[in-house]
A protein has these predicted regions:
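Alpha-helix capping/helix-boundary segments
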Residues: 42-43, 90-91, 137-139
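Acidic anion/phosphate-binding donor-loop and adjacent secondary structure
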Residues: 66, 140-144, 149-151, 158-169
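Short His-centered aromatic/hydrophobic patch
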Residues: 85-92, 110-113
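An amphipathic, basic-hydrophobic alpha-helix
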Residues: 38, 48-53, 58-83, 93, ...
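N-terminal strand-loop element at the rim of the active site
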Residues: 5-66
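Hydrophobic anchor at the start of a short beta-strand
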Residues: 32-34, 54, 106, 149-152
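A conserved, positively charged/aromatic
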Residues: 100, 105-136, 140, 145-147
C-alpha cells in the first residue's frame, strides 16, 4: 500500500515521534510511505534518517489555503492509496480537504482528549473515512462531540524501549 503521511508540527515531540515509528513499521512490513512536513522540522530530519522519502511543504496553520492547494497537487501527482493526517496544526483540516479534492481516502490520528465544539468537530472530521484515537479517553471525547462509533478505531501509541534497555549501575 502507498501511504502519504501529513504532519505539520515543527518539533520532534511525542506525536511526530509516533509518526516516525509508524512509518518505519509500515516500511518494514512492505508498505511505501512518504511524509509531507515543514522544511527543516524535527520530523523532517528524523524521517530522512530512517530513509523515508520527504516532501517539504510549509504550513502556517488551519487557514493556510495555499498549503491545501499545494498538498492537493502533490496528492494528485504522487497517487497514494490513502492519506494519513496526523497533527492538528493544519494537517487535519487542510489534509482532509486536500485528500477530498484529490479523491483519495484519508484517515486522521487524534492524540488529545480535549473537548471540541460539536459543529467544529463535524466539519473537521467529515472528510475522513476513519479516525484513529490513541486511547479510550480520546475515543470517548470524539463520541461526546457526535462522531459515529463506526468511524473511530483505537490504536495505542508505541514506545521504542531500546534506548532504555541498559543495565543499571
Amino acid at each position: 500500500m502507498k501511504i502519504l503521511h501529513v504532519e505539520t508540527g515543527r518539533q520532534l515531540l511525542g506525536g511526530p515521534q509516533q509518526v516516525v515509528y509508524l512509518m518505519r513499521g509500515l516500511v518494514d512490513r512492505g508498505h511505501e510511505c512518504t511524509l509531507v512536513c515543514p522544511p527543516g522540522s524535527g520530523i523532517d530530519g528524523a524521517a530522512r534518517q530512517q530513509g523515508i522519502p520527504v516532501r517539504s511543504l510549509f504550513c502556517a496553520g488551519d487557514i493556510d489555503l495555499p498549503f491545501a492547494y499545494r498538498l492537493t497537487q502533490f496528492i494528485k501527482e504522487s497517487k497514494p492509496d490513502i492519506v494519513h493526517c496526523h497533527s492538528r496544526r493544519g494537517a487535519d483540516v487542510l489534509g482532509g480537504l486536500a485528500a477530498s479534492f484529490a479523491d483519495v481516502p484519508a484517515v486522521v490520528s487524534r492524540r488529545v482528549d480535549n473537548t471540541e465544539m460539536r459543529v467544529l468537530a463535524a466539519i473537521r472530521y467529515r472528510p475522513f473515512v476513519s479516525i484513529v484515537a490513541i486511547s479510550e479517553a480520546v475515543a470517548s471525547a470524539l463520541r461526546n462531540v457526535g462522531i459515529e462509533d463506526e468511524k473511530i478505531v483505537t490504536i495505542r501509541s508505541a514506545v521504542d524501549a531500546a534506548p532504555f534497555d541498559r543495565p543499571y549501575g
